[in-house]
């Protein structure tokens, strides 16, 4: 079986396992599917020939590819996450393989009229000639991050079967609950034992990311007073209208749909409620730490103003930091970025360095003492029914993993 065939076989099998995380769950991991998937990977890592294969009580899978060199090479790690996003259903995924893709629109689901078009997704024609894997239009695909996970498995298998490629000790980890921000919560950095690592959790070809948002979450509870609308004058306080009022005080243009690059935002993720009580959940993002703190202060000030206007119980704020910009922790060990950059260039891949408008496990792990940049996996349009992945780009990602390992040994 060649690399491409192994990638397709593993990936299409892995995405059929429902591993969506669940923000409302307090178990670790938050869903049983992640445990099921982790157990499968433990067996397959052993079959490949890795050693020290473990899965702890929290669902974290770790394994070792022993060094095949006498050189003193730093221990490097490669990570991916077990769970898939909660934004769209991930149950009963039916991956569709399109070989030698013609670059034109693909009807994902004729019955539901779900069509993947170049008009909506202009990057689509650039994959002409590739083998791409799409959804059937009814679920997400789960390339985030089963593409990255598959690539690590295939790369480790390749290195075991090609001992002429010299490398130091490599550690592999698969983590649960990344999509809900809890990936590193129970990650044992000391047990992992790597000097630094790479998450395989990026997007299109060439992606190399070592800057992430500073991130916070804000949960607002608006408490109203419900009375009969016919006699409500000077009595009723509509909680949903309080939520609308709060949102109106935020800058309209500082939302995800109006921002790009290094611009931060406020994002209303959900709003549920009625006259008596409404709950709004926001995420707050910015690359610059000062701007990040200013955004949080703005939320606090709006809440304070509304409390003065309507009473302290009218608006209740719970706000917490989620992760910070990893750049601060990557800069002192910049060589790990340089080696990934050089690895890509040597494979005729043009590195595309840009800030992550999101977070990876690496954002938090970098602050836990494990500097962890992020590398592309080949996926597009994550978290929805138009998600797809190029197997040709997945193959390139496997080559990058192998080349990074080789270069660390060569330069030791």
Swiss-Prot record:
Binds 2 Zn(2+) ions per subunit. The keyword Protease applies. GO terms for molecular function: metallopeptidase activity; tripeptide aminopeptidase activity; zinc ion binding. Its EC number is 3.4.11.4. Zn(2+) 1 binds at residues 81, 144, 201. Zn(2+) 2 binds at residues 144, 179, 383. It holds the Pfam family Peptidase_M20. One of its GO terms (cellular component) is cytosol. Keywords: Aminopeptidase, Cytoplasm, Hydrolase, Metal-binding, Metalloprotease, Protease, Zinc. InterPro entries: ArgE/DapE_CS, Bact_exopeptidase_dim_dom, Peptidase_M20, Peptidase_M20_dimer, Peptidase_M20B. The active site is at residues 83, 178. NCBIfam families: peptidase-T, PRK05469.1, PRK13381.1. Cleaves the N-terminal amino acid of tripeptides. Belongs to the peptidase M20B family. HAMAP family: Aminopeptidase_M20. This is Peptidase T.
């Amino acid at each position: 079986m060649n690399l491409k065939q192994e990638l397709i076989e593993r990936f299409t099998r892995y995405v059929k396992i429902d591993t969506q995380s669940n923000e409302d769950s307090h178990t670790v991991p938050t869903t049983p599917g992640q445990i099921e998937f982790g157990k499968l990977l433990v067996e397959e890592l052993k079959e490949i020939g890795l050693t020290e294969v473990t899965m702890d009580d929290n669902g974290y899978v770790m394994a070792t590819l022993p060094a095949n060199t006498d050189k003193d090479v730093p221990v490097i790690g490669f990570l991916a996450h077990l769970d898939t996003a909660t934004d769209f259903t991930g149950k009963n995924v039916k991956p569709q393989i399109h070989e030698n893709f013609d670059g034109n629109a693909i009807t994902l689901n004729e019955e539901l009229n779900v069509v993947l078009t170049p008009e909506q997704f202009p990057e689509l024609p650039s994959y002409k000639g590739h083998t791409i894997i799409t959804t059937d239009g009814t679920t997400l695909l789960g390339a985030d991050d089963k593409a990255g996970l598959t690539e690590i498995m295939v790369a480790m298998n390749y290195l075991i079967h090609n001992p002429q490629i010299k490398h130091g000790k490599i550690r592999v980890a698969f983590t649960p609950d990344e999509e809900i921000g809890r990936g590193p919560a129970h990650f044992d950095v000391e047990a992992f034992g790597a000097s630094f690592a790479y998450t395989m959790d990026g997007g299109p070809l060439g992606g190399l990311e070592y800057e992430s948002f500073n991130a916070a979450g804000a949960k607002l509870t608006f408490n109203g007073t419900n009375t009969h609308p016919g006699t409500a004058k000077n009595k009723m306080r509509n909680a949903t209208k309080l939520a609308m009022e709060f949102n109106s005080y935020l800058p309209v243009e500082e939302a995800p749909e109006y921002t790009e690059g290094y611009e931060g935002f406020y994002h209303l993720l959900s709003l549920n409620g009625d006259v008596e009580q409404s709950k709004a959940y926001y995420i707050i993002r910015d690359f610059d730490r000062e701007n990040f703190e200013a955004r949080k202060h703005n939320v606090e000030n709006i809440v304070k103003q509304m409390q003065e206007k309507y009473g302290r119980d009218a608006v209740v704020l719970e706000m917490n930091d989620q992760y910070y910009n990893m750049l601060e922790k990557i800069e002192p060990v910049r060589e790990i970025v340089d080696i990934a950059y050089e690895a890509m260039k040597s494979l005729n891949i043009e590195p595309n360095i840009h800030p992550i408008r999101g977070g990876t496990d690496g954002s938090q792990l970098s602050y836990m003492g494990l500097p962890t940049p992020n590398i592309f996996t080949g996926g597009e349009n994550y978290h929805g029914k138009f998600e797809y992945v190029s197997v040709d780009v997945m193959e390139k990602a496997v080559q990058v993993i192998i080349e990074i390992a080789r270069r660390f040994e060569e330069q030791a």
